[in-house]
């Protein structure tokens, strides 16, 4: 796989933020491999999963749907996008204005295979 370019990273982040702001889970999930793994402190709080990890579009999609129902005015404000060799990091302001950074690792077909969410207090 070719290294990720800044152009790809910017396009991915725009599409990802736009899909979330539209509350369109199908569009959000279209960026992910079927068996991707998500790690987030919010999984503990919202999904009740003590490990903070969920696997697969079904589990993560159900968690995200629950989050959207809990926070119906959810809106992300993009701050920055950073490109790595096989990863993209998006820095944004999320729910309740909280700073967030998500790191996405890409696999075949430029689909996310692992995602890691980080939040400020």
Task: Give the positions of each predicted feature.
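A structural signal for well-ordered alpha-helical scaffolds and beta->alpha junctions
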Residues: 9, 13, 25, 57-64, ...
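Short glycine-/acidic-enriched loop or helix-start segments at secondary-structure transitions
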Residues: 6, 48, 101
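Short, low-complexity N-terminal intrinsically disordered segments enriched in polar/charged residues
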Residues: 1-30, 34
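A solvent-exposed, acidic/Ser-Thr-rich amphipathic alpha-helical stretch
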Residues: 27, 33-79
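General secondary-structure edge motif
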Residues: 8-9, 40, 44, 84
């Amino acid at each position: 796989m070719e290294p990720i370019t800044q152009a790809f990273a910017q396009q991915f982040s725009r599409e990802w933020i736009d899909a979330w702001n539209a509350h369109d889970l199908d569009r959000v999930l279209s960026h992910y491999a079927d068996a991707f793994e998500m790690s987030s402190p919010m999984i503990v709080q919202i999904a009740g999963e003590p490990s903070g990890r969920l696997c697969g579009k079904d589990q993560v999609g159900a968690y995200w749907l629950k989050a959207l129902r809990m926070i119906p005015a959810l809106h992300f404000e993009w701050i920055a996008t950073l490109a790595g060799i096989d990863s993209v990091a998006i820095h944004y302001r999320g729910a309740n204005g909280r700073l967030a950074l998500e790191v996405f690792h890409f696999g075949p077909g430029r689909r996310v295979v692992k995602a890691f969410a980080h939040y400020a207090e």
